[in-house]
Amino acid sequence: MMKNLNGRAHNACYHPYLHQLHQAQQLQHQQQQQQQQQQQTQLQQTPHAAHTQQNGLTQNAQPQIQWPYNSSAAANQYYQQQQQQQQQEQQMLRQRQLPTQQPAASYEQQQQQPQQHQHLQQQQQQHQLRQTFTNAATNTNAAAMAAMCQMQNFFTQQQQQQQQQEFNNNCVHINYNQQQQQQPTAAVATTTPTQKATPTKTTPTNNPTTTTNNSTTTTTTNGDKFAMDASEIASFLASELFMQQLGTFDGIQSAPTLTTPTLTPTTLRSIEETFFEMTNDAPYQAGFKPPPLAPLVNNNNNNNGNGNGNGNGNGNVLASSVVPTTTTTATIIGVSNPLISQQQQQQQQQVFDCGASVMPGSDTEESNGSWADGQMNEDQSISDTSSGATDSTSYQNGHMMGNSGGGNGGGTGGANNFSNVLAAAGRNTNTSNSATPARRGGGRRPNRSANMTPEEEEKRRIRRERNKQAAARCRKRRVDQTNELTEEVELLEKRGENLKKEMELLNETKNQLEYFLQAHRPTCQKVRADMLSVTTCNGLIGPPALLSAGSCGSGSSHHNNNSNSNDSSSGTITGLDATLNSTGRSNSPLDLKPVPIDEDLLLHIKDEPLDGALDSSSSLDQDGPPPHKRFALPNIATLMTPTGPAGSLQTPVSGTAPHGFGSFPTTISNISNISSIHNGPTLNSLNKMPKERPNTLAFQRPFGGQMQLSGSGRAPTQIQGVPIQTPSTGTFNFDSLMDGGTGLTPVSGPLIPNCTSQNKHPLELPTPTTEPSKLVSL
């Protein structure tokens, strides 16, 4: 039993084949020795006598080319060619040996000892011949070389073909090898170097004689030796593939096929199918799979396959016992032998078919036909259909397995059986196409209709028709539903695409509008309301307005100052004058209630000096409205401050007004008190708290010269017609300073402001509080 196809491990069945090879090699060497002795005896004769003898044998040769009679150099060249040819034959035979068994190796060593002795004798004889024939002409030597080359090429081709056929056929007779080797050497011995074109025409005629001994109908010549039919080509390729696969033992290739691929189970199966398609007609071609056939067994196995030298190990024991054949080579059904012609194979096939029909223990054609008819009737009533190609292939494989398996029990005469190895490889590697029927997954179990009445068959037919119609309706409904869903999906996709396009258009429009707004903003004449609004608390400016006022420009504020308004309900002051350089005064009259002041408590105060840094051309001097747009306060005795929910302020009012507030110290604490007033308690509660005031004010008198002119020695009671009423008992807070309730502002007469009485900036305004540490002294 073989373990693999690479030839690494093989069975002892190869031993007979090795012995046959050694015997053939020994006989060949003996024949070569005899031929050399004959050649030596012929060379002792004169070349003229040899030439006359050869002319008597070959009178029909072409007389165009003549050889010289005394051509010693040609004879020497001829024997050199023969020696080289013999050495090549010996090398090829050594390569075809299988040195894997130790007994075979020892036997080979025993056979090589006489071969070496013969080789030494041949070399000595050649040396003597070279010394005798050394005086040859140059032209005769060239002609002899050409003739010898042609002869050598032809003989090497013939010998290679014969040796390859000998190795492919495992049980070839030794007599066949002797005939094939004797005839070319005999032609060499009888042919002298006096002809050039004669060997190419005479020697091929000997080749058909060798092949007709084995196959009586095969005739091959040099012209049609490549004319092969389909079966011969298939068999040749199969044998080449198989021998290359099995002949590789430790780097030694038996068959020199360098272009053939590796033998695989797929190639084996395809080769088997090709053999059966071309050479064997299957008895059953109905398209279904028959049951596995029993192996063919013959009672004459012991007579034909009992391990003799020519024994058969195949499954065609019946054919070998019925038909007398001239050769005993392996002829399995579907495996063509290169030594047997196609007609002889057809005859054997016909006889084998006839014998198979009467073979005891095998299925006859009638029984198989009846079984096939019954199977067809059953399959007609069953809706299950099978593949004809697969079933026929599996049937052919199973048929071959049966034939090859039957021959294995006959004997072990055929050592290296090609068909048996193919069958074993196909059986081991191909499990899907085995002889057992493969079960198909799913489906209904076939019901046999043999025991059914016609009524039951009609009911089954009607039921199957209904099932078919229901299945068709189900398929149609499924297709319709699929189409509806597909259409709905397409509509939704289109709607989504439209929405995406609309979104893109809207985004483009938005981007364009934003670009237009950004481009129009620097040139727009309208001002946004959020940029002009100022947060107020009870008529007071809040911290956000103060912080934003410093960042806004005041270049054009004096042009639109008349549009300012104090909206105490909303808490914002709107207008273009965002800096509020007009100190937040409103155009409405102030409602202030005067408080009676004791004149005895008035102290002398110094006049406030004018701010020299401010002139009439400065921008801070002209923060207020122009003179022609200014108007005086109404002459009323009581002024009410619009403080909203905080109530009115009880601020004492004086008849004199200060010249300006530019000298008030400005601190960050005073500015931060604005936010505390905004978020702290109301102003009325702050005004009721007790406060401390200084008795004097650290101010310079602006009009000291006029006051010195008064000779009375007392301080003047008025300055430029404005009476001085100091000190006042009122509380000076932010509202009183902004609205004029300082006690120095006359309420009886009109108030005519001048440039020095305006504020420089809201940030410079003091913010007196009720805290003792933050009192403001005037």
Curated annotation (Swiss-Prot):
Residues 24-57, 76-130, 183-223, 294-320, 356-414, 427-478, 550-594, 756-778 are annotated as: Disordered. PROSITE patterns: BZIP, BZIP_BASIC. Residues 457-520 form the bZIP domain. Keywords: Activator, DNA-binding, Nucleus, Phosphoprotein, Transcription, Transcription regulation. Residues 403-414 have a biased composition (Gly residues). Residues 485-513 are annotated as: Leucine-zipper. GO terms for molecular function: DNA binding; DNA-binding transcription factor activity, RNA polymerase II-specific; RNA polymerase II cis-regulatory region sequence-specific DNA binding. InterPro entries: AP-1, bZIP, bZIP_sf. Residues 459-478 are annotated as: Basic motif. Residues 99-108, 427-436, 579-589 have a biased composition (Polar residues). Residues 24-54, 77-98, 109-130, 183-222, 382-402, 550-571 have a biased composition (Low complexity). SMART domains: BRLZ (SM00338). GO terms for biological process: embryo development ending in birth or egg hatching. It is found in: Nucleus. The modification Phosphoserine is found at S588. One of its GO terms (cellular component) is nucleus. Homodimer. Heterodimer with Jra. The kay-Jra heterodimer binds more stably to the AP-1 site than either of the two proteins alone. Belongs to the bZIP family. Fos subfamily. PANTHER family: ACTIVATING TRANSCRIPTION FACTOR 3-RELATED (PTHR23351:SF24), FOS TRANSCRIPTION FACTOR-RELATED (PTHR23351). Developmentally regulated transcription factor AP-1 binds and recognizes the enhancer DNA sequence: 5'-TGA[CG]TCA-3'. May play a role in the function or determination of a particular subset of cells in the developing embryo. It is able to carry out its function either independently of or in conjunction with Jra. This is Transcription factor kayak. It comes from Drosophila pseudoobscura pseudoobscura (Fruit fly).
